Amino acid sequence: MPELPEVEVTRRGVAPHLEGQVITGVALRHTGLRWPFPATLSQTLAGRTVRSTGRRGKYLLIHFDHGTLIIHLGMSGHLRILPSDVPPKKHDHFDLEIGPQLLRLTDPRRFGAVLWHAAEDGSIENHLLLRTLGVEPLEAAFSAQWLYQQTRNRSSAIKQVLLAGDIVVGVGNIYASESLFQARINPKTPAHRIGLARYERLAEAIRQILAAAIEQGGSTLKDFIGVNGQSGYFQQNYFCYARTGEPCRICKTPIRQIVQGQRSTFYCPNCQK
C-alpha cells in the first residue's frame, strides 16, 4: 500500500499540473472503487479551478473554492499526468481532465477512493475519514513529547500503535519497521513502557526516514510508480523490511519476521531491545 512518502511524492508531482488550472471534464469508468463515486462529480468539478493541493496522512487533497476532492490510492493505485488523447487501459478508473492533459487514477485492486467534501459541510478536517487522524509526522506538532504523552495508557505493541494512525498519521508498515530499527526499539515493546529518551530517538527516526523516502521517490515493491512513470528507490536502503533471514546491516544477526495485527514486522533481535 502506498504510504505517506508515496502519496507526498505523488502530490508534488501533480501539483504543478493542477494548481491554477481549470477542470475541463471528468471521466468515471465504474460506479466506484472502495466506495461509490459521487453521483454528480462531473457537474461538481467541470469548469472549476484548482486552488491548491494538499495531503493528510495517505489522502491526497485537491482543493477548490467550493470543496475538496479526496483521493486515496488504496493497495495498488497510482496517479499519472498524461496527454488527453492517451486511451484508458483496463484498470484506469478515473480521469480528471485539464485541457490537453489529464490526471489518471490506475487501481488494479480497486481499494482506492475518489470522494468529494463540499465546503458547505465545514473544514476538510471534519470529513469522516480525516477527523480521527493523528498529527502529521513532518510537521511541528509531532515530537517525542507528543508520542510519550499520547501513549501513557496504550499497552499495545509500539509497532501497532504507530500503524493505528490516531497518534501519528501515515507511518505505515514499511516505515514503522524501518523507524523502529533506526531507533533501536523492539516492535513488540508495549508503547506505555517506552520512556521519553527512546521516544526522542523514535521521533527523529520517523522524521529522517520519511524525509529520505520522499527524496528518493518512495518505495516501489510491486505497483507504485510516481506521476512521471518512474519507480521509487528507497527500498534499496531498507535495513530490515522484507529482509527475513538476511544479516543485519549493523550486527550481522539474521533479521527476524513476525506477524503483528495481521501485518508482517521485521526487526533485528540483537539491535532492537
Swiss-Prot record:
What catalytic activity is recorded? Hydrolysis of DNA containing ring-opened 7-methylguanine residues, releasing 2,6-diamino-4-hydroxy-5-(N-methyl)formamidopyrimidine; 2'-deoxyribonucleotide-(2'-deoxyribose 5'-phosphate)-2'-deoxyribonucleotide-DNA = a 3'-end 2'-deoxyribonucleotide-(2,3-dehydro-2,3-deoxyribose 5'-phosphate)-DNA + a 5'-end 5'-phospho-2'-deoxyribonucleoside-DNA + H(+)
Provide the E.C. number(s) assigned to this enzyme: 3.2.2.23, 4.2.99.18
> Can you tell me which residues bind DNA?
H91, R109, R154
Name the coenzymes or cofactors required.
Zn(2+)
State the UniProt keywords alphabetically: DNA damage, DNA repair, DNA-binding, Glycosidase, Hydrolase, Lyase, Metal-binding, Multifunctional enzyme, Zinc, Zinc-finger
Q: Tell me one Pfam family matched here.
A: Fapy_DNA_glyco
Any one GO molecular-function label of the UniProt entry: class I DNA-(apurinic or apyrimidinic site) endonuclease activity
Q: Active site located where?
A: P2 (schiff-base intermediate with dna), E3 (proton donor), K58 (proton donor), R263 (proton donor)
Q: Which InterPro entries match?
A: DNA_glyclase/AP_lyase_DNA-bd, DNA_glyclase_Znf_dom_DNA_BS, Formamido-pyr_DNA_Glyclase, FPG_cat, MutM-like_N-ter, Ribosomal_uS13-like_H2TH, Znf_DNA_glyclase/AP_lyase, Znf_FPG/IleRS
Q: What is this protein called?
A: Formamidopyrimidine-DNA glycosylase
